[in-house]
Amino acid sequence: MKISLLPAALLTLSVSAGAAPQMCFDQAGKDYQIDPLLLMSISIKESRLTPGAINGSNRNGTEDVCGMQVNSSHYGKLKNFNITRERLLNDPCICVYTGAWVLAHNFRSYGKNWDSVGMYNTGPSKKLIAQRKAYAQDIKNIYRVLLARKKLLSERLAPAAGKENEIKIAETASLNSGQ
């Protein structure tokens, strides 16, 4: 998906700050063709899913804001889409979409791989390869836990759904036989 999708998605998506966070990850993931659980993994690592998180202690003088810890180095480009620091902090869906936009840019520029995920935190600097790999490994570990949790939940729900279908089939069969 093209990076230019951000303004269109944000214009058509009028979700308030009170929107269900899962919906924001799901929709941003769908629009940017990124697994929502990967986006959530980044937010867990970056801020423990804290919408108003602010980290102003970067060595290079930049700050990271919102649940996705979007770096202030992106503010110039985001201004073109009417996305400000305040919007990132006050609208969790804008924050998630912006994080997805950053990650999608990395995937488009450097390939869809764990190194690009690591660049979400470090950028492409060759001086930060070790830090990038460590960050990517942390995200991978969180992502694996979320995937395992999703699988476990679906396995637990599947038998219940199967029983409901058996009951419906039995009810339909008895209705059709005139009983």
Where does each model-flagged region fall?
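Sec-dependent signal peptide recognition
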Residues: M1-A9
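Low-complexity, Gly/Ser/Thr/Pro-rich intrinsically disordered linker/tail segments
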Residues: A161-Q179
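N-terminal signal peptide c-region/cleavage motif recognized by signal peptidases
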Residues: T12-S16
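Intrinsic disorder/low-complexity segments, especially N-terminal tails and targeting/processing regions
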Residues: L5, A17, I169-E171
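Catalytic glycan-binding domains that act on GlcNAc-containing polysaccharides
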Residues: G18-G162
